[in-house]
């Protein structure tokens, strides 16, 4: 009986995830049936109502209170509801990712997307050099990878699959249909990412989540750990680093912006400073979040002070007994 309990305890989450696959696919089918705008509105409405009762809402509220200490509780809770609305909309929009990016420069008024910095996409595509792009969980954060593919930019997006099997399978299918290269974050992923850059390709990564083995930077005035991969690659290959963000407009419409290459700080030897480079990227992300705080993923435990590296304390010099003894001998002989 004990052995059976241990087996069930180990495999129950996976079994539950597999059992959820039909339900998730039914919801996906329903979202497609509703159409883009109705699905987005419905997903947002459900998340606004359900989200505040979920455990993750406590994380969102704590993060918002720390980031905006000057705001009252009503404003904090309103921002949390906006964040839930954005998350619900983004989830529902997965059913329409293949058609969501429908930009037509000849008829911009009728399109769901507008793009600023298209010339940077084209420059990255045509310069024959590798390039790096950082992003954040803002608005519908899947759209930059789709935009790159539509502009003919060979790019590989680094992604972290959802925890539950049902969502992970469905999201992977949608991403394969709409995006360029994909690389799952993990232990062995660094080598494949390095290979992308060595071949002259382009790599995109979301940098606004906790990374245990990361470097320390400041985000909203508090220390956080960030994955240093992009800075290390920029240092090694001397390739440009751009930022990309999405801003949600009304009725499932979006504005996408690709920044010019960042001027990253360098050390005394003229090489890119990894910690300084990640701080520069994180500063850009903070500016984006401050512009549209209700469109960021506040439910993530971005600040984890107990996981920060302990400050190094210089060892206290112990007195040398032999020196004291020599001093005593000298004073006696004098």
Task: Report residues per predicted region.
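Membrane-anchoring hydrophobic helices of lipid-metabolizing enzymes
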Residues: 2-135, 170-172, 179, 323-332
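Non-catalytic C-terminal accessory region of glycerolipid acyltransferases
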Residues: 11, 15, 70, 81, ...
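Short, composition-biased local secondary-structure segments
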Residues: 29-34, 140-145, 193-204
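Active-site metal-coordination segments of metallo-dependent hydrolases
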Residues: 58-59, 160-165, 224-227
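Catalytic core of membrane glycerolipid acyltransferases/transacylases, capturing the structured
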Residues: 86, 100, 126-186, 212-217, ...
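Short, flexible loop segments at the rims of nucleotide/cofactor-binding pockets, characterized by
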Residues: 107-113, 160, 179-184, 219-221, ...
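Short amphipathic alpha-helical segments and helix-helix/interface helices
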Residues: 121-122, 145, 171-172, 193-194, ...
């Amino acid at each position: 009986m004990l052995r059976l309990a241990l087996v069930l305890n180990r495999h129950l989450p996976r079994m539950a995830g597999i059992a959820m696959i039909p339900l998730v696919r039914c919801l996906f089918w329903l979202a497609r049936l509703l159409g883009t705008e109705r699905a987005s509105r419905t997903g947002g409405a459900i998340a606004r109502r359900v989200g505040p009762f979920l455990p993750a809402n406590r994380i969102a509220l704590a993060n918002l209170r720390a980031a905006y200490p000057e705001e009252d509780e009503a404003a904090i809770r309103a921002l949390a509801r906006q964040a839930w609305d954005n998350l619900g909309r983004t989830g529902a929009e997965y059913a329409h990712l293949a058609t969501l990016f429908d930009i037509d420069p000849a008829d911009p008024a009728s399109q769901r997307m507008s793009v600023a910095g298209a010339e940077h996409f084209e420059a990255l595509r045509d310069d024959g050099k590798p390039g790096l792009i950082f992003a954040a969980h803002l608005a519908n954060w899947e759209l930059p990878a789709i935009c790159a593919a539509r502009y003919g930019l060979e790019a590989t997006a680094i992604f972290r699959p959802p925890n539950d099997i049902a969502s992970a399978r469905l999201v992977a299918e949608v991403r394969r249909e709409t995006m360029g290269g994909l690389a799952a974050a993990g232990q062995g992923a660094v080598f494949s990412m390095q290979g992308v850059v060595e071949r002259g390709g382009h790599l995109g990564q979301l940098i606004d989540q906790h990374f245990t083995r990361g470097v320390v930077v400041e985000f909203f005035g508090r220390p956080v750990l960030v994955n240093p991969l992009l800075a290390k690659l920029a240092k090694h290959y001397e390739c440009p680093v751009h930022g990309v963000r999405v801003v949600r407009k009304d009725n499932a419409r979006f504005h996408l912006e690709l920044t010019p290459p960042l001027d990253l700080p360098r050390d005394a030897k003229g090489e890119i400073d990894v910690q300084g480079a990640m701080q520069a990227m994180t500063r850009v992300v903070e500016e984006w979040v401050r512009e549209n705080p209700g469109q960021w993923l506040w439910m993530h435990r971005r600040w984890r002070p107990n996981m920060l590296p302990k400050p190094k304390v210089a060892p206290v010099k112990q007195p040398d007994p032999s020196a004291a003894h020599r001093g005593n001998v000298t004073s006696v002989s004098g």
